[in-house]
């Protein structure tokens, strides 16, 4: 998964919609660099993230995206005090993550962006 990761402090995870990319957050995320660790991934198959093999790959569904998101967060040691900022397709992924990992979540924000 392609992503950028900048700053220190409690992590803020920005999740974009579908079809979109981390570019959605280009004017918002930098406002938090001085106070938080800001992580902005490109979900699988979007933005600069790798495309999966095969046109009909079964991981291009909600369950597949959720699996990749969880593996990604573990790989960069995101485990507690998480602030989620979610939009569109990222809302479903983020809300499921929050429901199943409520002890790790500090806050959540659902956004409506054009």
Regions inferred by a protein language model and the residue ranges of each:
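Glycine-rich phosphate/pyrophosphate-binding loop shared by adenosine-nucleotide-utilizing enzymes
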Residues: 1
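A general secondary-structure boundary signal
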Residues: 5-10, 63-66, 70, 89, ...
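Short, hydrophobic alpha-helix immediately C-terminal to the catalytic nucleophile
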Residues: 26, 70, 95-99
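Glycine-rich, phosphate-binding/catalytic loops in enzymes
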Residues: 29-33, 55-58, 100-103
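Conserved hydrolase catalytic core segment
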Residues: 35, 79-114
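Active-site loop/oxyanion-hole signature of alpha/beta-hydrolase fold enzymes
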Residues: 40-85
């Amino acid at each position: 998964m392609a992503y950028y990761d900048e700053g220190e402090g409690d992590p803020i995870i920005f999740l974009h919609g579908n079809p979109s990319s981390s570019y959605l957050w280009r004017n918002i995320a930098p406002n938090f660099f001085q106070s938080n660790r800001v992580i902005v991934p490109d979900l699988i198959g979007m933005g600069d993230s790798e495309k999966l093999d095969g046109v009909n790959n079964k991981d291009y569904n909600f369950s597949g995206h959720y699996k990749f998101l969880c593996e990604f967060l573990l790989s960069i040691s995101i485990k507690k005090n998480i602030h989620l900022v979610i939009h569109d397709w990222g809302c479903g992924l983020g809300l499921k993550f929050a429901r199943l990992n409520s002890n790790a979540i500090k806050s959540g924000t659902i956004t409506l962006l054009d």
